[in-house]
Regions:
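Short glycine-rich anion-binding loops that position phosphate/pyrophosphate groups of nucleotides
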Residues: 1, 48-49, 200, 225-228
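Acidic, Mg2+-coordinating active-site environments of NTP-dependent enzymes
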Residues: 1-192, 216
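Alpha-helical elements of the RecA-like P-loop NTPase motor core of helicases
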Residues: 52, 202-205
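Short glycine-centered, acidic/aromatic-flanked micro-motifs in structured strand/loop junctions
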Residues: 139, 197, 223-225
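Conserved cofactor-binding/catalytic machinery of classical short-chain dehydrogenase/reductase
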Residues: 152, 199, 203
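Hydrophobic side chains in well-ordered alpha-helices
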Residues: 168, 204-207
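Active-site beta-alpha connecting loops in nucleotide-dependent enzymes
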Residues: 177-180, 202, 209-251
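Switch II (G3) loop of P-loop NTPases
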Residues: 193-199
Length: 251
């Protein structure tokens, strides 16, 4: 969205406004027909280089999540090209996705949780050893990057509905894929076709690595970048696609 925000610092500050707004009020949600006051909580991907910036933008509690570089962009590179993960801030609760296995129609992974829910106990920093819980996740959402989305959702639903992480995680098997997001087109053909809405360099870096990893043959990519919005991303997207795919078709 740099065509609107003009530069990264402005974009990052505007995003941080979401965290700053947490200090203004708690949320009032209608749950089971009743209005319930839900304490505000921030949720952040700890693999984001700006994670500490967002955390510092609010006085409210922030719960994080990470795969320690095992999914998305961080998992795409190895050796000297490996992405350096930012240091996890002290005294922040977070969950870690591990053993991520993505297949054609879904994924499974385990999660180590700091605590049993997103609720922060009083004097949390002084509580040692901290209580942990392990979850086993299965979902009909292909793509290892969805481990991020699932963990963020578990934290959010736990906070809003006042449910434990395990209660929320038990429902992930019922999740329905969103059309246009890693949608598999199966008409009996001898090859696999996937449709995804990815339209930015970061999303390309997220979806191509897991597909490349499990692709046994050649990988083709068909995409375009119509309109006159962000023209600077076009060559970057082409470079990323060319890195992971055998043939790239520009529409």
């Amino acid at each position: 969205h740099l065509e609107f925000h003009k530069d990264f610092e402005t974009y990052r500050s505007d995003k941080a406004n979401l965290f700053r707004a947490l200090d203004l009020h708690d949320h009032v949600k209608v749950i089971a027909g009743e209005k319930v006051k839900v304490p505000s909580i921030g949720i952040v991907n700890l693999e984001d280089p700006s994670a500490s910036y967002f955390i510092s933008a609010t006085k409210k509690n922030v719960y994080g999540f990470t795969t320690m570089g095992k999914a998305g962009k961080a998992a795409a590179e190895t050796g000297s090209d490996a992405c350096e993960l930012p240091e996890i801030p002290e005294n922040i609760r977070y969950m870690t996705g591990k053993n991520i296995a993505s297949a054609r129609y879904g994924l499974c992974f385990s999660v180590d949780c700091d605590g049993k829910s997103s609720f922060y106990p009083e004097n949390y920093d002084a509580v040692l050893p901290r209580e942990h819980e392990n979850l086993n996740i299965q979902a009909n959402l292909p793509g290892s990057f969805n481990a991020y989305n699932i963990m963020a959702s578990i934290i959010a639903v736990s906070s809003v509905a006042n449910l434990s992480f395990s209660e929320v995680a038990s429902k992930t098997q019922s999740l329905l894929p969103v059309k246009g997001r890693m949608t598999v087109i199966d008409k009996g053909q001898m090859f696999e076709v996937i449709v995804d809405y990815a339209h930015t360099p970061s999303s390309f870096e997220t979806i191509f690595p897991p597909v490349r990893k499990r692709c046994k043959g050649r990988l083709f990519a068909v995409f375009g970048s119509g309109g006159e919005r962000d023209l600077t991303k076009r060559p970057i997207q082409g470079e990323i696609a060319g890195k992971f795919c055998d043939i790239v078709v520009l529409a």
